[in-house]
Amino acid sequence: MKEPIVNGSDSELELLISELVNYGIEVFNKEEDKFQRWMKKPTNSLGNNTPESLLDSVAGIQEVRNCLNRIEFGNLA
């Protein structure tokens, strides 16, 4: 039996996640290992959730991106 074709919503999330990962690696000075560790660590600014736990919605992905923006520009509050 064939796998179902990915619906539009899923492909949008996949694209946003891909862009987020690329951005995150840049924020962590192209050190992918550091970025991957950060993704698995609970973060205060994300309500003590891990960034990777929020990647199931557009809103969650945007929250993680906002957090990365704060890291990039030194505004960790």
Model-identified regions with their sequence ranges:
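Non-transmembrane "mature" sequence context
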Residues: M1-A77
